[in-house]
Regions:
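Helix-to-loop junctions at the C-terminal end of transmembrane segments
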Residues: 35-47, 256-268
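Cytoplasmic membrane-interface "Motif A"-like loop-to-helix N-cap segments
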Residues: 44-55, 265-277
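C-terminal ends and interior cores of transmembrane alpha-helices
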Residues: 56-74, 277-292
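Hydrophobic core of transmembrane alpha-helices in multi-pass small-molecule transporters
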Residues: 75-94, 296-311
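Glycine-rich segments within core transmembrane alpha-helices of 12-TM secondary carriers
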Residues: 93, 114-139, 161, 336-348
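Multi-pass alpha-helical transporter architecture, strongest
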Residues: 165-172, 370-391
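Extracytoplasmic gate region of multi-pass secondary transporters
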Residues: 200-252, 345-348
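C-terminal transmembrane helical hairpin of 12-TM major facilitator-type secondary transporters
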Residues: 269-315
Length: 391
């Protein structure tokens, strides 16, 4: 898509991917701002209204991305408009993190926070799977049919889902825990200021424990397929790789819910620490097998990565949300999630491509995963029982 909007077909595959992933990363830089804005709305006026506004803004940005003329029609304005739309989309996505606060506040005494928190992650996994399937369909369009309208189909599908989401959220009731809180106390005037003044430690911990999740999520969902098909120089069939990737993402969704439920029994901290060690240990073998001309090895690589990644993904939402009391939870969780995303997640495909480019070593991206696995493990190790808030 970026090639259509920037008017260039880059022969250098590294330059092409770096450009594409740079546009992808732009939206992540806007997410913390969106988290602060919608966090203020969610903590002061209610979770429901914040979630409605965020999905409406998301749908607006998707609409404009869908109708942007290509470079041949409006020149330099095409990539400029794309970046603006990505920024708006990033702001909206920053507000979407509050879904987690909304979900776990339906739990009684926090007994199934891990399971409920995993549902939000499951929706993201399903969304990624749907996006991959739609992209696979658009690959069947060739020539002018793709240039003129084929590339717009994924955005049309996204807009359709956005409209459905707005309708569903209008019918949802406010979370019981927030309603009880609002009956007993007056909501804070500036949740963001209170967060930075009184909750620096849990805020920093939430950012750091989420880094390995954000890093791994975007490597699995965005980078792996491009790495296998284009950057690793394998001679495998692209269509088969897309099927393997889609199946892997589907399995990841199932395992995520399982590990979320498991964490309610054995502890979120314990599950995530073991999973972080697992990701550290498998990173180098995974990138090595994914660069081989063997479908069996590629499948093994996906399995090796997906199991520990799902174990991080399942409990992470609840583990982060429980670090904040209800009066700043929407703001605290949203900002932590999106700062972590901007630091470790959104730029992951770009950094991994750059690492291969400067080192000419196919397993170089493993160092990026291993770095964040260590950081998140250390952050998890210092969390104590007194840091946890359960409604």
């Amino acid at each position: 898509m970026s090639d259509l909007l920037n008017g260039k077909t880059l022969e250098d595959k590294y330059s092409s991917f770096i450009l594409t992933f740079s546009v992808f990363a732009v939206g992540f830089l806007a997410r913390p701002f969106g988290a602060a804005v919608f966090g203020h709305i969610g903590d002061k006026y209610g979770r429901k209204i914040a979630l409605i506004f965020s999905i409406v803004l998301m749908s607006i940005s998707i609409t404009f991305m869908m109708i942007i003329p290509v470079y041949n029609n409006i020149g330099i304005y095409a990539p400029i408009l794309l970046v603006i739309c990505r920024v708006i989309q990033g702001i909206a996505l920053g507000g979407e993190a509050g879904n987690v606060a909304f979900l776990i506040e339906h739990s009684k005494n926090g007994k199934n926070n891990g399971l409920l928190g995993s549902y939000e992650v499951l929706s993201a996994v399903i969304g990624s799977l749907m996006a991959m399937l739609v992209i696979m369909i658009t690959h069947h369009f060739t020539g002018n049919s793709f240039v003129i309208w084929g590339w717009r189909i994924p955005f049309f599908v996204g807009l359709f889902i956005g409209v459905i989401s707005v309708c569903l959220r209008l019918r949802n009731a406010e979370s019981p825990a927030y309603c009880m809180y609002k009956e007993q106390k007056i909501p804070l005037k500036l949740p963001f200021a209170v967060l930075l003044k009184n909750y620096k430690r849990p805020f920093l911990l939430a950012i750091l424990i989420d880094c390995i999740e954000n890093c791994s999520f975007h490597i699995l969902m965005v980078f792996f397929v491009n790495f296998i098909n284009e950057l690793s120089l394998t001679r495998v069939d692209h269509h088969c790789i897309n099927i393997i990737a889609s199946t892997g993402i589907f399995v990841c969704g199932i395992l995520t819910v399982y590990f979320g439920a498991l964490s309610d029994f054995v502890g979120k901290k314990k599950v995530m620490m073991i999973a972080s060690i697992g990701l550290f240990c498998v990173s180098i073998p995974v990138f090595w097998v994914l660069s081989q001309d063997s479908y069996i090895l590629i499948i093994i690589g996906y399995i090796l990565f997906i199991i520990p990644f799902s174990a991080v993904l399942g409990p992470v939402n609840a583990a982060m949300a429980e670090l904040f009391p209800i009066n700043i939870r929407y703001t605290g969780f949203g900002l932590a999630r999106n700062i972590s995303s901007a630091i470790a997640g959104g730029g992951a495909p770009l950094i991994c491509t750059w690492l291969i480019y400067i080192t000419d070593i196919k397993i170089a991206p493993a160092m990026y995963v291993m770095f964040w696995a260590i950081i998140s493990y250390i952050a998890l190790s210092v969390i104590q029982k007194k840091d946890i808030y359960v409604d």
